[in-house]
């Protein structure tokens, strides 16, 4: 079976071809269009892999994408209903990036763009979405482990922001997850923006900035995220508005009352900003350690696979290695929730 994994609505767009379970090609669009972390539809990648008219797509049995848009619509609807009337702001295009607006109608958009290459009469292979965090968990398949615990943490997927999986042999299985609003990744991103940097991009700068701060805000930052039993946690939404306004107004007045006004982009970095960065990093590491300690107590296994955007946080990875004392695998490309991850999960499901 030949499976084509395709990413077209988020950063790091590209494709992967899996043939009888073996990767034959993994190609990110940025290698061709020279735009780092590009969100462009991978037109050049498709042409490179299948020819100018896409004729080679006839040899593909299944196309898969790392977003289950039906599941995302359901969970988006729940968030919308829970936050009425203010959550109606989430229906405004400006409350999300253009790419996130596209995800909810991904299959239709994908078919239309592929037919611009192949022509309208071309019969495309069926398009099968897989869960976003499932695709992240596919990092296990490129690990050297026969079994492992798998932690997926990012901004949000189609139904979760944190997911715990068990990996064994050629299968991964989700054990539990946290919903899309209780998102450590979104907290990190919106505090990054508060500190005057670009969200969904400059989180690494804030991680580095944390080394220059002190612990004066750590205790207050723990008020934002509560640790619960069984390795779970909850974000105190009295500090955050992203469940009602998205990116338009992600922080509440309560947040500003505690931490002060936001730093404008390019503004002077005050000691207060450094302390907020320190607190953000310290609490992030603490939450991840809380989750991992519980997941390993529930399923003892010395091997851990870490995937999703949080896997890009060096401080988190270092803290995990110091705490666990065992192997912590971070894939060479933690954004494996892309084309290859989707194709690997589709193979596990038999392409169905």
Regions found by a protein language model. Give the residues of each.
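Short acidic/glycine-rich loops and adjacent helix/strand connectors
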Residues: 1-352
